[in-house]
Amino acid sequence: MYSTPAPPEVTRRNSEPSTRQGTLGSLQGEKGQIIFPGFVVLLTIILVIIAACILWSWKKQKKRPVPYFQVAPSLTLPPPRHRAKNIYDFLPRQQTELGRHQLSGFSTESLLSRASDSPEPEAPQANGSLQMHRVSVHTVEYSVNIYDNGTVPQMCRHLASSTHHVCVRTSRSNPSISSKESNDYVNIPTVEDTCETLTRIESTPENHLGLPSALRLEFAEGGHAGCGNATDHDGFWAPGPKCSDSLSDGDDLSQTSNDYVNMTGLDLENIQENRPRGAFQCCRDYENVPWVDTNESQLPTLEEVASSTVDHREPVWRTLSSVYHMAFQPSAQSEDSAMVHREEQSSEDSSDYETVLVAELEGRDWKQGPGTQHPSDEGTPGDLAGKLCEVVYPAGSLATETSDEDA
């Protein structure tokens, strides 16, 4: 059972192929181990190069110059350039301080004050026995509220049913009066309308009564003895419930406005009258006046008013039971003028205690103020006879007197 050994040549041939296989396997294993670390090293080198490039580019951008101007410290700033001149440098010093033009406001007071600086025109001498007297009203500022109460009766001879005529003479330098606080339209009638109105007033009968629907303040320009001549008159109309026929078509605009007209800041320094007119007496409005016994206190009151208002050039402002009380001294008349005494009328049913007083002073010569000539110096002592028509209305009503004109 024993085998014989193989010859040595055969043994060598069989061992050579196994050795070759072992060498090839070892070489492949070593080759794989060498490639992996090389790949890792190559990847690390690439990453380092990329990081270095990023850092280099960042430093390069940081060293790049800034495009905007760098602000230096305030101590090293150069002096500023001279700017353009202000447009207000050429203005006066006062306006330069204000920084703008000072606008001057337009007001009625400024116009009246400018007109008052102008010299007063000389009025012509009167042809009658009474010398012309000049009455100047000096007021600083006051307000006149005119109300139209349709239920209050009145007693005056020359007052028509459509207009309440108040004649106040003023100089030509004040042709118009405006009201800043009023929303009314002021319409000035023509000369023809004024003449027609005066003609209708003179032709009105004595027993014609009733409160007017429109109140007219007529400012004459001086130079004529009476109010009958309307050639130089300027009309100032305050609106009422109804308008007179003498109003023009444009006067309808005042129908839609309020029932009162405020005249504030009226300067009447240049008011001229050809004869003494009397005094203005006023006090607070919207208060009731109790009824008084007119038989005992009427005549003394009228005599006191007549004596106190004629002795002064300036009108006397007096307080009478908290109502607007305005009395005008009558104009001069001839010796043959008729004296009429009218009855007083009082409305006790009214809540406002209206009292209408009418009185006539017969055979009384009016004393003249200082610097004037007494009427008896030029004519007979009985040349002048006056009448005083005194009307008291509540809450801002006006009481005026109108006298008869020579036919």
Curated annotation (Swiss-Prot):
GO process annotations (BP): adaptive immune response; antigen receptor-mediated signaling pathway; B cell activation; intracellular signal transduction; lymphocyte activation; negative regulation of MAPK cascade; negative regulation of T cell activation
Name listed for the protein in its UniProt record: Lymphocyte transmembrane adapter 1
Induction of synthesis: Up-regulated in T- and B-cells following TCR and BCR engagement, respectively.
Tissue spec: Expressed in T-cells and B-cells.
Ranges per topology, Extracellular: 1-33
UniProt note: phenotype after gene disruption: Mice are viable, fertile and healthy, and show normal lymphocyte development. However, their T- and B-cells are hyperresponsive to stimulation via TCR or BCR.
Post-translational modification: Phosphorylated on tyrosines upon TCR or BCR activation; which leads to the recruitment of GRB2, PIK3R1 and GRAP2.
Keywords: Adaptive immunity, Cell membrane, Immunity, Membrane, Phosphoprotein, Signal-anchor, Transmembrane, Transmembrane helix
Any one GO molecular function term: protein kinase binding
Lipid bilayer topology: Single-pass type III membrane protein
Cysteine pairings via disulfide bonds: none
A GO cellular component annotation in the UniProt record: cytosol
Transmembrane segments: 34-54
Annotated function: Negatively regulates TCR (T-cell antigen receptor)-mediated signaling in T-cells and BCR (B-cell antigen receptor)-mediated signaling in B-cells.
InterPro entries: LAX (IPR031393)
Record-linked PANTHER family: LYMPHOCYTE TRANSMEMBRANE ADAPTER 1
Subcellular location field: Cell membrane
Top-level taxonomy: Eukaryota, Metazoa, Chordata, Craniata, Vertebrata
Subunit-structure text: When phosphorylated, interacts with GRB2, PIK3R1 and GRAP2.
